């Protein structure tokens, strides 16, 4: 009877450990996808604003922020003062101090609040994920941007009639060339705007994706085919 009880206790302990590891893996995966979505919103924010508008785009960003905070808390992470990088904090503090001699102090104060908020979120993201997972989240976000960009460009090139305006500008008639979201030049070999609606940020995202993929492959030596295809 004692032997059976010991075996039952050991099995229960192993089961609890496996369940705990599974929960941790699930939380890490959810955190990675949430951070990837935040990176997507950051690097392709113009496309999101083109869909929802300047005010409406705050809603998906707020949902992402709340999701991140909840996951950050339930994962047991915390923002300790020693985790704050000194140089970054000094720079943000100096920018905040500039409100004292700014010609537009109220506007400077608004941007100071925004800078402080973004700095806190950035530090929290760095604390929430280890470096390998953080690079993985960046790669995911960049792949989503590049993938959605080619899908949009292909749809407009094959089925569209001329350039595509962002949804918030539909029904406004002819627009200036710089206002259009997708130019539909994919089949003509012209430059593509992609989901960000601007060729320059899209090219920057493509470059960052290439750098992250190469660094991850050099570190892990895995996913050679997928890395090659994305490059």
What residues fall within each predicted segment?
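Hydrophobic core segments of transmembrane alpha-helices in multi-pass, intramembrane catalytic enzymes
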Residues: 57-67, 110-122, 200-216
